[in-house]
């Protein structure tokens, strides 16, 4: 047995326990850090070749591992911009250097420019979004991503572009009978305009629909739309839409505001043995309204919310994942970058594939268990002391060997 080998083994053990104490200290320090993932020290033996009749003590080496795939507890808050992921995936954030990173730390707040940034200063990334149209995702990269910005637009108005109007037309009405209903629409400045829908019976199972701007008296459908019905009173006209081209026909008021082209869906129109009855219709657009806040749903769609109750979709938050999350490379600020063994980064949306759902008004706590860390600290302290005794014993034996010549 080599005395120097014994001492080296003791030093190896002390270094290993020192590394373990370092991870324990880091875990305890970050126990309250949002989205922090516990670090642990794994030990493996080092074996040295031995000769006949002798044994060379080896040592121990350590490797730090991170429990990145282990989800922490969810705590709920009153801020809509606090986000947590219930399931797999990471938020994609941008650092001050313009580099994209992954994180589970979702304590986002708007900065002075309206960008959503977390406590470490990283900016949340997503895709610009239009209602009903999913953005095109580059599944293995970050191309097309933009900063999620909630800067207030102040007062905002939207002109009407599409709507619907359904009605039952009385089958027993005489030819020439006219039934009228109306629909409020919005011009380009959010002013309300009234469109009258005039239904005139022209023959058996046949009617015409004329849409008229009430203020000017001008028809927006030239010529009137012909409506035809079968014996069951079902509409057979195809397509069951009409474009009320107000931009060309309605004279603009003194403000210069105009009613643009509005596509009206009349597919719910019927002809039955019942009195004229309109379904009330629907229209998009809105009058001027102030921003009242924002809302983020479980699919990651970010809406600006106005005082009139209108929700305007602006962004869809992107998520990313890898095949081996525990092999991601930790960076300062509680973020991660792609590691050598983590696998390629896959980009997608919450609620699809292996991605979890986004919880608004919630944060993911660290996955550190203080009781376990304190236990590990005591174990490491005792093991460090034991390894120091090995070193001390080897030193004392070496001193005995040196004193033999005296």
UniProtKB/Swiss-Prot annotation:
GO biological process, alphabetically ordered: bacterial-type flagellum-dependent swarming motility
Give me the Gene Ontology terms describing cellular component. Answer: bacterial-type flagellum basal body; bacterial-type flagellum hook; cytosol
Q: Name one Pfam family in it.
A: LlgE_F_G_D1
Which SUPFAM superfamilies does the entry link to?
Flagellar hook protein flgE
Source organism, top-level taxon = Bacteria
- Cystine residue pairs: none
Keywords, A to Z, come to: Bacterial flagellum
Q: What is this protein called?
A: Flagellar hook protein FlgE
Which gene is the coding source of this polypeptide chain? flgE
